[in-house]
Amino acid sequence: MAKRALSPSARRERQRLVADRARALALLVDGSRADSPAVDGTILVDGSWYNAHYWLRFGLMLRALGLKPESMVLLLGPYSRRESRNCAAAFNIVREHILDIDRRDAAATAEARRLLKDTQTPDDVLNWKLPHDFPPAQLYDSILKEQRKASLDLDDPQLEGRVAKALTALDVAVQTLDMHQPSLLLLSHALNYELSALSWIAAKRGIATVVLFGNFGTQRFWRLTRPEDVFDWCDRLEREDFEALEPSRADALAEAGGEHVTGRVSGKSTDIGAIHAFQNDTISLERTSVTSAMKWDAETPIIGVYVSNLFDYPHCFGFDQYRDFADWLEVSLPVMAANRKANWLLRAHPCDVWYGGQSMVDLLPPELPAHIGICPKEWNGAAVKAACDAVVTCHGTAGLEYAADGKPVLLSGKGWYHDYGFAIWPKTRQEYLDILSTPWWRDANSAEIRRRSLIVSGLSFCMPGWQCGLVFGDDSEQDALWSAMESRLSEYPDTVDQECELLSAWFASGERFFHTFKMMRADSYCMSNVTTDHATLHHVGTESAAISAPIDSSKDLSPPTVNTTAVNT
């Protein structure tokens, strides 16, 4: 059957998109200014993930390092090859290499069959011994993402093929690196079948690898220096550097962080998570509305329990005390059922509907105890936060949002902000369950929780003052980003130049996280992707009205002492 031609309106839209893309890419190409490249040898450029902002990030990196197209090889995956080729052509990249992980590989299929033969539970997969010491958690997460299930489905008729694909991806990674002997890899992610394999093998070989990531409208590039860095990739300060922050910088970060969190929970942030969490104004409610709807006593504390999207790479931040998010929820529910000192409000991830697939409600029993309720998805996130007294989360931004109000935060274990001293961080699964069984939310130091979390929010959500205005949209906006990108690049050429100069300095420094590198060298801070009529600059060295106490660099960052004697039921 012949492919149906585009309608006139669709054809015009396609032509407009192509023109927007060409103009945006031309601005990036024309800005290349380095006389000699910062990297010798072959550079492998990821083209397996097509997104306007990925090519923005690549263009900034090319400009910053003076990379030459003749040294580059475009890596193509199974999807969006035409679009990626078109973008690469704008940079005069002509060589390409296909990452053929979908090929029928007899050896990989046989090995997949052998691994699955003695696999009885999803937990068994996490104990597999894989080639090149590849982490089974990454294989688990890649398959889980495809299945869109809460836990890996062993009855999936395609499971053998999925495991074989993961094993083939490792073979393809080895063959690709052997063939091209690259000096540098530029990747969009270090997740999924082909990119997790490439990043792991490259790190084991000591090949320089930079992931061109972005978040909150800004560039969040990071580099792998060790294989285990694949589980530690969220832009962050090390604990000792956080403790050593000079008071004036901590204050400026806290002021900016507080302003950003306020804008975020007010529904003014443009990232996809915040849009779904806080821009739903259909039902805004008071605490009494919550207790009335749930038939709860108004005086009993309400603890929010925020559940992550079940199949969104659960192990990506080193989440190693649980099989997956479903396992965490399943072991938490009986403890919450026994702890009647609080009412527990279960909230599914706000993006679950957008993602599709299984969600929190699919895991819950038909009947819950009266003191455990399910938060309706229509309830506004800011109103829910205001109604709750504390929160339990794995590693969600809810921890920062609650802590900004001085409310206690209990984590399931390690995440990306676990060791900054504002949240209770259990070191083991059993310690988490022991704490969960107690009234852990009592006697919290609200001022300390708020102060420390706002500093982290400043580092995580905000950006340097000199960059104010150069904020890009969310990757989920897809092709609509091209037009906005052109406008931003045209409006802020000097800021783009400064960004590239810092990118060059960061690459030479050897530090892992670009955004942190940039923030620690700034003399002022402002909100990033929060819509506002004017931006406030929070200067280092200026007295802070919001946070007056300097960060105590001698303070131990161990979690607050919690009496782990179980409460009476």
What are the residue ranges of the model-derived segments?
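A donor-sugar binding/catalytic signature common to diverse glycosyltransferases
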Residues: L187, F213, R220, K377-I424
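A short, glycine/small-residue-rich beta-strand->loop->alpha-helix junction that serves as a flexible
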Residues: G47-R57, L187, Y313-F319
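Short loop/turn segments at strand-loop or loop-helix junctions that form parts
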Residues: D46-G47, L76-Y79, G214, I302-P314, ...
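Conserved N-terminal ligand/cofactor-binding loop architecture of enzyme catalytic domains
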Residues: M1-D46, A64-L167, G214, T218-I283, ...
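Donor nucleotide-activated moiety binding/catalytic core segment of transferases
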Residues: A164-D178, A298, A342, D352, ...
